[in-house]
Amino acid sequence: MTAKKQGAQASASAPSGDSPAERAQWLREELERYSYQYYVLDAPTIPDADYDALFIELQALEAEHPELLTPDSPTQRVGGAPLSAFDSVRHRVPMLSLNNGFEDEDVINFDRRCAQGLGRATAAAPAAFATPAAPADDLFSAADAAEAAANTAGNAVEYACELKFDGLAMSLRYENGTLVQAATRGDGETGEDVTANVRTIKAIPLKLRGTAPSVLEVRGEVFMYRADFDKLNARQAESGEKTFVNPRNAAAGSLRQLDPRITAKRPLSFFAYGVGEMEGFDRPGTHSAMLDGFAKLGLPVCDERRVVRGAQGLLSFHREVGERRDQLPYDIDGVVYKVNAIAEQEQLGFVSRAPRFALAHKFPAQEMTTTVEDIEVQVGRTGAITPVARLAPVFVGGVTVTNATLHNEDEIRRKDVHIGDTVIVRRAGDVIPEVVAVVLERRPADARAFVMPTECPVCGSHVERLEGEAIARCTGGLICAAQRKQALLHFAQRRAMDIEGLGDKVVEQLVDLGIVRTPADLYKLGVAKLAALDRMADKSASNLVAAIEQSRETTMNRFIFALGIRHVGEATAKDLAKHFGKLDNLLAADEAALLEVNDVGPVVAQSIANFIAEPHNVEVIEQLRAAGVHWAETEPTARAPLPLAGKTFVLTGTLPTMSREDAKEKLEAAGAKVAGSVSKKTDYVVAGAEAGSKLEKAQTLGVAVLDEEGMLKLLAEVGAA
């Protein structure tokens, strides 16, 4: 560390005549204090040489007296022995992602939603935002007066604004003030235990200052300053090692080293920005106060933040940060807005695995031109055929891009992309590269138009594109290697063949090891083969074999649903089983016959017909029957008009005597369609206790509202009770 101002010699205030234990404790406290001044306050008070001398003295003392070594000693940051792998960590509070905004309108709509959710009126969005730009030496000095003028009514929502760091999200768990665990975000539910590596990051305190909660889980970002990144790459180049493409990749790669000693040599930093768990301490009333509290505990918190009111304050912050983005000492890809009051955050809650009270406002993506060398297709896990442009390498948005999504065939036609074209490539949201436009004046004479393949490049099955859909799909769902894992998981789910114990991890191993290729292969599995899988004991293997054996006896509608035919859900599977009675009747049906089935329209009929027409799918069905999968069959039933056919219902709230699933079954048995959201096409809303926004929307649209008794009365009136 380089001192900004020289202090007295570090040892001048050391106690004299102290014991080794007292001296070691004093050294630890001094080193942590100097680290706090350097990394948190950005105000070092001693030169590097003095710090190093204290550090070496403590190392020597602990080596001479091993009993004095403590887990939170600064000497423990140097890294221990290499790990064989990272353990998984289940986040007690999920690390959710944020919804993104890219345009000013997205921010205005976000503010409006927050205000409405909190029961506040919102002013009309301003036509322009004329807040003066901040002076070059002060990012936020120009905003306060403009914000006050824009929110004179005092009714606007208050937000905490922060930078969105381009690093790696991290969870730090402190118990009684001591760091006990660090984990990556992972998929939000489960991350990796990187405690040994995080302990080497000098910016992260091993012991919190002052009075800390009994449990505090801090959320933040591990990143690398640009200057540190440049120095690291220079060292890598000098030693003949591979250099990193950008600070984010360097930070992520450094943190995920199995050898903590390598991580210890990498200049990683950290900023705290949120909290997961907190026990033994009252939470502050606002997000901004919580960040202030973090700083008092010795956690690094970015100073580039502000509390504002309303959409204008948010947009002013975004604009000012954007103007200074290139001058900041670290990479950011946007700013983050959070409703400041914690009580209001709780009132707004969450939707679709993201908080309603927060928004990540991304900066405009960077764009570059390159050439399309080829257009290939990729097959997704659900069979979606996605065209991908293979590009001449181009450095854009901080990375070298060689591929870009073209989304679908219509998008290629709309943008008129040809093989050989010069195109503008953008990293949408600074993450996913995409082709934005073609530079037509540079089109070569030998440019070739893209032709969507008629056969799947993975399994050779027919490629279908249903009317009204933009995505083409492989029809070989049961045999296509690209779809194999998803097909098996769907086949085994509770509402299909109900094979308990056949989850993600088991399916992943069975497919990756080549043990299972189609659902029929499941019925060849024995205990020995399953027990050989990772984390699969003999008892678990025996239970899974028993569950597979039990699934041989099923119902025709469950079997049809388990096949994973596109657009065929549980209700349609029941209709097909009831209508045809025997599976062979279904397999022999053409589109005209399928259209005779209740609630089967042209799109569903075409999807079923395409599935049946694929020989590989019929072959797997026969293999399953040969493996002993069976069900009771009946005689076909003629289609009869159902009393509520054509009527759409929506269920909301808690019904007094039945579950919503039971109510749904009754309504569907009478021919009704049960939808998940209210629209002008909704005929009835059945509302129970604590009905929410669906009931409000129904009342706004004038949709008929029934309670459970009213629904049962209606069913009785039409003879469907």
From Swiss-Prot:
Binding site for Zn(2+): C456, C459, C474, C480
Keywords: DNA damage, DNA repair, DNA replication, Ligase, Magnesium, Manganese, Metal-binding, NAD, Zinc
InterPro entries: BRCT_dom, BRCT_dom_sf, DisA/LigA_HHH, DNA_ligase, DNA_ligase_AS, DNA_ligase_CS, DNAligase_adenylation, DNAligase_N
Active site: K164 (n6-amp-lysine intermediate)
SUPFAM superfamilies: BRCT domain, DNA ligase/mRNA capping enzyme, catalytic domain, Nucleic acid-binding proteins, RuvA domain 2-like
Catalytic activity, reaction form: NAD(+) + (deoxyribonucleotide)n-3'-hydroxyl + 5'-phospho-(deoxyribonucleotide)m = (deoxyribonucleotide)n+m + AMP + beta-nicotinamide D-nucleotide
GO molecular-function terms, A-Z: DNA binding; DNA ligase (NAD+) activity; metal ion binding
GO cellular component, one term: cytosol
UniProt keyword Nuclease, yes or no: no
Domain named BRCT: residues: 639-721
Comp. bias (Low complexity): 1-19
Gene Ontology process terms (BP): DNA repair; DNA replication
Region of interest (Disordered), residue spans: 1-23
EC number: 6.5.1.2
NCBIfam families in the record: dnlj, PRK07956.1
Record family assignment: Belongs to the NAD-dependent DNA ligase family. LigA subfamily.
Primary role: DNA ligase that catalyzes the formation of phosphodiester linkages between 5'-phosphoryl and 3'-hydroxyl groups in double-stranded DNA using NAD as a coenzyme and as the energy source for the reaction. It is essential for DNA replication and repair of damaged DNA.
Annotated protein name in UniProt: DNA ligase
Organism listed in the record: Cupriavidus metallidurans (strain ATCC 43123 / DSM 2839 / NBRC 102507 / CH34) (Ralstonia metallidurans)
